[in-house]
Design a protein with these regions (language model features):
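Mixed-charge, Lys/Arg-rich low-complexity intrinsically disordered regions
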Residues: 2-12
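Acidic, low-complexity, intrinsically disordered interaction modules
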Residues: 17-60
Length: 60
């Protein structure tokens, strides 16, 4: 995912070093819901964003 809004400094650092493992995107009545699993510094993270606004950012 690129150009995400409302990211923290820590999230930006994780995203800058991340490798995408799985990415999906769906259009739900005009809302673009993106989901992605990334790997950064040996840790895995699950992200979800709606219209480029992060709704979930968790380590798995």
């Amino acid at each position: 995912m690129q150009n995400l809004k409302n990211t923290t400094k820590e999230q930006k650092e994780i995203l800058s070093n991340a490798e995408s493992i799985l990415y999906t995107c769906k259009n739900d009545l005009g809302n673009f819901i993106e989901s992605e699993v990334i790997k950064s510094n040996g840790k895995y993270y699950r992200l979800q964003a709606t219209n480029k606004h992060i709704t979930e950012f968790t380590e798995v």
